[in-house]
Amino acid sequence: MRFAELFRILALEGAQLIVVPAAFNMTTGPAHWELLFRARALDNQCFLAGCAPARDETAGYVSYAHSLVCDPWGRVQAQAEAAPQLLICDIDLTETDAVRAQIPVLRARRTDLYQLKYEKDS
């Protein structure tokens, strides 16, 4: 979540849904988990699903939990609690095209001023 460029690359490659397995801890989770998922969804105008383990206070690493799904507008569509939960959320992938047409952030990038370079495996 902290590496915005990765999500931009995926969006430029046509991603409409990005599934992110992650486990923020109890320090960063409350402050950053939802904020970063909403920002990455909004920045790249795609759905993001953050899949986190449920919280286990007896574990060596205590996960913040709170799996969630954000839409291309950066709105939270579904969010789990800290306890084990099956999170189900209906999404319409055509919504990414509609949002990208309404606010063409990806097309408005100034690639004449900066480049995002990455190497693709062939």
Positions of predicted regions on the chain:
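CN hydrolase (nitrilase-like) catalytic-core segments centered on the catalytic cysteine
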Residues: 1-87
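Residue-identity detector for threonine
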Residues: 27-28, 58, 94-96, 111
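A short, polar/charged loop-to-alpha-helix boundary motif
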Residues: 84-101
